[in-house]
Amino acid sequence: MNVNSSSNRGEAILAALKTQFPGAVLDEERQTPEQVTITVKINLLPDVVQYLYYQHDGWLPVLFGNDERTLNGHYAVYYALSMEGAEKCWIVVKALVDADSREFPSVTPRVPAAVWGEREIRDMYGLIPVGLPDQRRLVLPDDWPEDMHPLRKDAMDYRLRPEPTTDSETYPFINEGNSDARVIPVGPLHITSDESGHFRLFVDGEQIVDADYRLFYVHRGMEKLAETRMGYNEVTFLSDRVCGICGFAHSVAYTNSVENALGIEVPQRAHTIRSILLEVERLHSHLLNLGLSCHFVGFDTGFMQFFRVREKSMTMAELLIGSRKTYGLNLIGGVRRDILKEQRLQTLKLVREMRADVSELVEMLLATPNMEQRTQGIGILDRQIAREYSPVGPLIRGSGFARDLRFDHPYADYGNIPKTLFTFTGGDVFSRVMVRVKETFDSLAMLEFALDNMPDTPLLTEGFSYKPHAFALGFVEAPRGEDVHWSMLGDNQKLFRWRCSAATYANWPVLRYMLRGNTVSDAPLIIGSLDPCYSCTDRVTLVDVRKRQSKTVPYKEIERYGIDRNRSPLK
């Protein structure tokens, strides 16, 4: 891609890096003026990532592997760093991994945020992060063959059926609370579960000593599906289905990645329409989570009222695109449908109604003593832990970090729409609730401005050519935090590689630190403050570290106890 060097960001950071590590950078390739990929010597990979992360205000929302043996004879690992200091840009650190040894030095001991990504690279590609502290599988099940790695370009024999796993558990749940408690798991399936997943709380009486969890029991294989079965624009509609609430955010991130790779100029009106729908999605998600927060503290009147107002955000989506879910609008290069004057006026009317409704509900919420009593000082995310693990969204902003991609790396029309960045310093559940409250009002103001100031341009750029093996990042500040996608185009009208990273993926690793020192009855509220997919936590094992006993209970029972605080499930 031709990039005007005079407007390139990150040059000062790269110059400092080259001075600090002479000869470390082997290659440098610009994707956009704000994005650059550097290939570094593999033995210096941890040093380079650590230097950018801590010395230049970098954050690590995503890392991934790629099988590039047909391109250069190697595997590759990519660490995408969002640089959020004085010079804001994206620096992607790439290292080539020998195809025979498959070893690369783990970054996790230097930057803990890399832990889940490196575990996934090992599972999906068979690469070996030497020095990785957590050697457990992340994605693959225990009975998956050791020599089969799904995202390699090798031919897969889909007829293979592995031998059944034994009744004995092979996955070690970790308790860092200095206890030799024995764990007796049952499951992970349970009749009350919406979806498989296993969540463990290690407790001493009612107090949580530690927590561990295993997810990925139902892995949809969307990245492999995109690479093998779908054309470029078909993946746009697949990305819509990544999440049931913020699917539009994923489709914007995906299309943005391809547009950045090809240098496509998206019409301004399409940018504005994308921003409008992204804020409608934020309203939907935040109002849902605020309602659930009411439910978890036993304030079900607030729960029902917030869900009543949330319905208006779905009516808004139906007005704008014909569906209560924001599906099917994006294409590479723009959008498929316009917002007409009548729809715009009706939406503005709904915005005014929602502002009045939400103001009344928030006043009622903050006047409810139980809300502050149950949320202040609970589930604290320590600033040091937050800095080390790169969580995202309201979770990180509730711990005092001013991080939001709409401000740090404006995309769509966010460079033109007035907006406010809200942070709270408490680090607790209450702070995260308040971030969502403030952002709800700001989304309404942004919608009003965007609907009143829609540019008169086309909706779609057409006539561009796809370039094999061009690649770039695309990103969105979804309601839960950063959705970051990376796409490399192929030479057969399909993607060579698609990395799709959702916000909750970045937030899971810090949850165990937020649960420690709190009580069992606070667990649903703390977990809910992340705004994760609840089906991931529908099964809980409680392990009493004093009595060395474990008890498996439905998540709904923990939720019930968190609301009424009677009849402890531990007894």
Residue ranges of each PLM-predicted region?
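Metal/cofactor-centered catalytic core regions of large enzymes
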Residues: 42-45, 112, 138-571
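Terminal low-complexity/charged segments
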Residues: 1-210, 367, 371-373, 387, ...
